[in-house]
């Protein structure tokens, strides 16, 4: 449930880009440096009071973002000044844009209607030292047409147990398995030679869902699975039936819809 800011506070939102290879994921972890930890510490240093951050999607270690969205409550401040100061403290691996006051019931996570991720593969004869942090290098020539055809089987509402890590939630104080039913709005496999880009938009994602779908599509692109196999993989609801999880560096959270 989304609540309004405490008395004397305003709600703010911002877009955030980051190089995920420099952090151990987005979510705070006291033992390692994370995106949320760096942002919160920087905001608290500038603003002078405790901050609680909410994000649209908690990316894993090594996963990047161009269009992550955060929200938080704070006392009134000079937006332009705070944004400049924040970018100085967070550079060079995090950039904050479009910091603005928003409505009291906005929540970066729960107000979102969809998220779009891009997965980038370098499909070339030679690796590229300038893209290795942001793409999965695969030398074997991929059958992009078969990958695109196969990908359409994931569109719609499905139980994505075959493509996600199991998770639990607390219900009345007891742990229960979380639902892995999700709705994929669109998926496209693009030839952007020498890169192959896989764009996926869904209302929400479960853990490792995009990377598992990509790993399966790559197996199809290499001829190790048939393009007709995706539907049966979904219906099995068995993680072992899908392809391997693609490495994190090729994945970027591109946009969040509201």
Label each PLM-derived region with a short phrase.
Residues 2-258:
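Structured-RNA-binding interfaces characteristic of tRNA pseudouridine synthases
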